[in-house]
Amino acid sequence: MRILAVDDDPVFLMLLEHVLTAIGYKDLRTVESGAEAMTLLRDPRQKFDCLLLDIDMPGMTGIELCRRVRALQDYHDTPVVMITAMKSLDFVEPAFRAGANDYVHKPIDELEMRTRLRMVGDLIEERRRRASVESRFSTDHGLPVINVRFDEPVALSEAGSVIDYLALENYALTLGRLRLYGHSVLGFKVTNAESIFCSTDGIGYIDTMANVASVIDGALKSCNHLIAHAGRGEFVAMISQRTDLDVDLLQDEIDLAMDRYAHLHEALGIPLPDVTVGRILHTGFFTRTSVSSLFKEARQSVRDVAMVR
């Protein structure tokens, strides 16, 4: 794994290099500003597998740098881990909105960094495997292709509040139990997602799920929220307040918005997505519900609603 680390503190970069070397990551390049990083990233002779970005830098912040990185075709889905010494979590959500995949605190803990980079490595290997399959198919048939599994939480980027599922889990983990108590979680399900998946190719399926994400994003516009596609046509939304939205009204708004795509889907021969809204969930103040369990509960909730709808 070739890593680029960006931080305006040269002493921290030396310490980071020491930690990374100790856990087996020796191919590291460091720079001290966002401008230097962008120069490297635009150089076709350079290629990095993972970016470690300090959030609080003078001039171009790490969040702005992350946003610019995501605009580069070669780094659209490269894993980005944000690093910061700031204690406030006010900037965490903007970092994930900008495209970050994960987040760690200074001072760097060796075990935490090892765990984060192991997850990054797994993500890189999965994306390399998919790219290899897509490349072979494209070479054999001369057609663009995206290799997608139905149960895979494929990344969608068309809507402003949509982030990767892993990133949403990582964001929720940064909140801690107290802050998580102040959030609401809501599941959505495209009940005919498997029919859509079978009726089109990977590009068509991702485009359709992206349209659904945009509709959900619009329906939740009155709330500060983040959305992720969890696979199998299911979505999880985190709302940054304890809310009791009228789920029936939300369902009606989504149905109405999806109807606007009816003519397009008819022309393409792809079933129009049938989206179901689940129940709004909250964590208890004294409970120790894990983030993964909370998200699973949200997905199960919408499955239950879909069965009786």
Describe the residue ranges of each PLM region.
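Conserved acidic segment of CheY-like receiver
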Residues: 1-20, 51
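Active-site residues of response regulator receiver
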Residues: 7, 54, 84
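Receiver (REC) domain active-site loop signature in two-component systems and cognate sites
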Residues: 57, 69
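CheY-like receiver
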Residues: 122-176
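Conserved long alpha-helical elements within nucleotide-processing catalytic cores of c-di-GMP signaling
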Residues: 154-173, 179-184, 191-217, 228-232, ...
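A short glycine-enriched loop-to-beta-strand structural element that forms part of the catalytic core
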Residues: 225-240, 263-297
